[in-house]
């Protein structure tokens, strides 16, 4: 598992940051969606709560994803940001992981948003790359 440095964690925790999670189904059909709820955990993993949506369906078929995270928009070649390459460790439809994620979402987005969450996903970070890498 790749290590998340302090700069990456700080960017996750910055209000107004922008994040896009890219997934693909078992046939390679891509999907990208804006997410504000991904967050780093103490063990270096990343968690997110998902509704029954295309992202969740894709992750059930293909465990690989990329999270694109930037400080702010508009994005330029100088905008601070990273690409985090992820692999699903687990998809939790019940139990303490889902409960913790729903609690976090309830606290930050309200109980209605939390009640829509169908699964909590835990990712291992396999690689961290800068937003812009020539080569």
Where are these regions (language model features)?
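Binding-site signature for planar aromatic cofactors or substrates
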Residues: 1-135
């Amino acid at each position: 598992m790749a290590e998340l440095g302090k700069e990456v964690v700080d960017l996750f925790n910055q209000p107004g940051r922008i994040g896009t999670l890219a997934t693909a189904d078992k046939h390679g059909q891509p999907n990208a969606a804006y997410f504000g709820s991904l967050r780093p955990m103490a063990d270096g993993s990343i968690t997110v709560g998902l509704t029954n949506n295309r992202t969740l369906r894709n992750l059930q078929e293909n465990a690989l994803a990329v999270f694109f995270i930037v400080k702010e928009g508009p994005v330029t070649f100088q905008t601070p940001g990273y690409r985090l390459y992820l692999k699903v460790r687990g998809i939790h439809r019940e139990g303490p992981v889902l409960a913790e994620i729903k609690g976090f979402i309830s606290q930050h987005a309200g109980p209605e948003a939390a009640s829509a969450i169908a699964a909590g996903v835990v990712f291992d970070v396999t690689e961290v790359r800068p937003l812009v890498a020539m080569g």
